[in-house]
Amino acid sequence: MGEINQVAVEKYLEENPQFAKEYFDRKLRVEVLGEIFKNSQVPVQSSMSFSELTQVEESALCLELLWTVQEEGGTPEQGVHRALQRLAHLLQADRCSMFLCRSRNGIPEVASRLLDVTPTSKFEDNLVGPDKEVVFPLDIGIVGWAAHTKKTHNVPDVKKNSHFSDFMDKQTGYVTKNLLATPIVVGKEVLAVIMAVNKVNASEFSKQDEEVFSKYLNFVSIILRLHHTSYMYNIESRRSQILMWSANKVFEELTDVERQFHKALYTVRSYLNCERYSIGLLDMTKEKEFYDEWPIKLGEVEPYKGPKTPDGREVNFYKIIDYILHGKEEIKVIPTPPADHWTLISGLPTYVAENGFICNMMNAPADEYFTFQKGPVDETGWVIKNVLSLPIVNKKEDIVGVATFYNRKDGKPFDEHDEYITETLTQFLGWSLLNTDTYDKMNKLENRKDIAQEMLMNQTKATPEEIKSILKFQEKLNVDVIDDCEEKQLVAILKEDLPDPRSAELYEFRFSDFPLTEHGLIKCGIRLFFEINVVEKFKVPVEVLTRWMYTVRKGYRAVTYHNWRHGFNVGQTMFTLLMTGRLKKYYTDLEAFAMLAAAFCHDIDHRGTNNLYQMKSTSPLARLHGSSILERHHLEYSKTLLQDESLNIFQNLNKRQFETVIHLFEVAIIATDLALYFKKRTMFQKIVDACEQMQTEEEAIKYVTVDPTKKEIIMAMMMTACDLSAITKPWEVQSQVALMVANEFWEQGDLERTVLQQQPIPMMDRNKRDELPKLQVGFIDFVCTFVYKEFSRFHKEITPMLSGLQNNRVEWKSLADEYDAKMKVIEEEAKKQEGGAEKAAEDSGGGDDKKSKTCLML
């Protein structure tokens, strides 16, 4: 073969272009050129400079990255990883990294996503999983500072830079000398920070490196922008779906908050991007009932010292609804959840309810402030990783519940966009409560209207003619208009016509209303107010007092037992306890005035049926009042009367005195609910025990009077003693009253059987009337004995009530024993007859040959 020279080679290549193309493609690839310049020992005879070769590399890499950008199916991290590999090669950097920027709880932060990328490293080795992220705020490190300033930072010597943090170096053992960091910015939002670390064969990155770095990161920016745009589209799409479906469901349900929340939350579950979420509903009670505060005021129960909502309510989750979306979908409802339930034990829902903050936590089990359960929370084996908790706030800015979301489906921690979506949902749910609140208010107004109409149709206040029948000013003063009379004249006329309290036995515990007419009882009631000296002291106009008393009488319906006679008897017993029983010494004249008036009103407008019947029949009263239904109605009726100036016997009191009267009305009338009796009797017993140990009467009076709570407890028990006082009357009175009570119960039982289609309890079953004595003995033993036994210990003057009770028990026990003996004889006779019939059947059956009871053998 001849000698090969340059001219021959050029001629051959020109004549064979295909060969030339394949040859140069093979020999002048980017990697080969790079290796030539990296290896200084390889001799290269060429006029092409390093910069020219770098431009060749850049052009080839740009083409490769363009293909990467348009590839489908890959993750953005994969595209960025390829770019960082090439960038590390071009810049001669030891390694490159990417930190993503995000916000949690309103605080921006950066999190490692790709770490230590080299030209030859694998994607799987560089990708940082959600559970291994290194997260730090923007005020730590040069990366955070680059995200904060949104500028490129070329740091020749990190030790001389005040923003440098050696946290990562300490974690990895790597030594950072110099670095180049650039943020990827979209508008005003920083998506990520790209960092090149430690220039190889040089002490720092040059200006030319910065230019290449900036130019090359345009491709990274495009990749991240595309991903960000897609992600934001997904966010807005999910948000719009949540709003649309929530609006659809909350307007389907207006009557119940729990059902309203459940419908909305269950419908939008697929758009929430989490494995599980729970809703904790808060008790909205702002003030305790007075009888629940008594143990606290007496020092028997420690005051509540736990967390409270911003509006002052105790943080009490009365129900938790747990939505499980991983594995098999399931919904768990936990009424009255215990404090150690896994959703509450961490303390996070309580913290959110107390402060109203949004709490977004990554790696929740490692948190030091909240104690999340580190292992599986239930039988499914599911564990908590990341948590996002938000308050549900209504239009009044009251926190009504707490929504907590667990474990984002892609394993990443919840970010600001998840906060945005869930906050949209919880805000909408909170605002939608306006619908249920409005519906509830309208419903209550409708019920109040129905009740008011019923009251007006059934009762009206006393007419002028009815007042004249008691206050006989026309007859005695020959005056046609009462306004023409002086108050002193009216007082004299009224007192003259009122019965004598001694002859009417108004001071006696044995008082019986049977000899008196209902009209006469009105006069007796007025007399009692004069006897406690409140008419003159509080300047009560006698016309108003007469009208009020007559109207109260008309307010009682003509039912079998809970009628005006019962109302008067309770008022008379209250008077007797105060005066004859000497309990008045614990109360002021104003308090005694209010107690006596409340006693007369305590059962006004009673319907002859109890609270349970109101609930069973879903009456307007039951829909209006949640507890102590009838008692609250009696209270509202009484307060309604006082709103009419012509009926307001307290019209001359000042504002503070009137508020005291209304409060005492509330305590006294609500206390007649026997369902509350067992709550208050132990507290009363302790007061009696304490007074028994005291040496003087003055000491006992001081012990009671200095504490308003003790006075209220005694007053509440006095109302119970008054309400049950018929059981202490002489036998000839008590036996008749008991039959009236029983008849009213039987009438309710008839209603339950016919109207409600339900079987009444034995006490209200007319078919079991013969068991009345036995029921009376049980009622005396279980309910009544304690009341009068304790009052007899408290004040010996009240012993006649206990004696009357014990005498009546003997009578009822005797009747009960007679009934039991009679029933025993009947049962024995029935057994004898049954035994005789069986023996006769055996005799007629021919020995052991038994006949079938269902078949006839022919």
UniProtKB/Swiss-Prot annotation:
Subunit structure comment from the entry: Composed of two alpha' subunits that are associated with 3 smaller proteins of 11, 13, and 15 kDa.
Record keywords: Cell membrane, cGMP, cGMP-binding, Disease variant, Hydrolase, Lipoprotein, Membrane, Metal-binding, Methylation, Nucleotide-binding, Prenylation, Repeat, Sensory transduction, Vision
InterPro entries: GAF, GAF-like_dom_sf, HD/PDEase_dom, PDEase, PDEase_catalytic_dom, PDEase_catalytic_dom_sf, PDEase_CS
Gene Ontology cellular component list: plasma membrane
Propeptide residues according to the Swiss-Prot or TrEMBL record: 856-858
UniProt cofactor note: Binds 2 divalent metal cations per subunit. Site 1 may preferentially bind zinc ions, while site 2 has a preference for magnesium and/or manganese ions.
Active-site positions on this chain: H562 (proton donor)
Disorder noted: Cone dystrophy 4: An early-onset cone dystrophy. Cone dystrophies are retinal dystrophies characterized by progressive degeneration of the cone photoreceptors with preservation of rod function, as indicated by electroretinogram. However, some rod involvement may be present in some cone dystrophies, particularly at late stage. Affected individuals suffer from photophobia, loss of visual acuity, color vision and central visual field. Another sign is the absence of macular lesions for many years. Achromatopsia 5: A form of achromatopsia, an ocular stationary disorder due to the absence of functioning cone photoreceptors in the retina. It is characterized by total colorblindness, low visual acuity, photophobia and nystagmus. ACHM5 inheritance is autosomal recessive.
GO molecular function, one term: 3',5'-cyclic-GMP phosphodiesterase activity
Modified residues (Cysteine methyl ester): C855
EC number assigned by the record: 3.1.4.35
Any one biological process term the GO annotation gives: visual perception
SMART domains, per the entry: GAF (SM00065), HDc (SM00471)
Lipid sites, type S-geranylgeranyl cysteine: C855
Ranges of residues in domain GAF: 75-224, 256-433
Annotated source species: Homo sapiens
Effect of Y323N: In ACHM5; decreases cGMP phosphodiesterase activity
Residues at which a divalent metal cation 2 binds: D603
Outcome after substituting I826S: Found in a renal cell carcinoma sample; somatic mutation
Region (Disordered): 830-858
Outcome when changing R104W: In ACHM5; severely decreases cGMP phosphodiesterase activity
The name this protein goes by in its record: Cone cGMP-specific 3',5'-cyclic phosphodiesterase subunit alpha'
Essential cofactor(s): a divalent metal cation
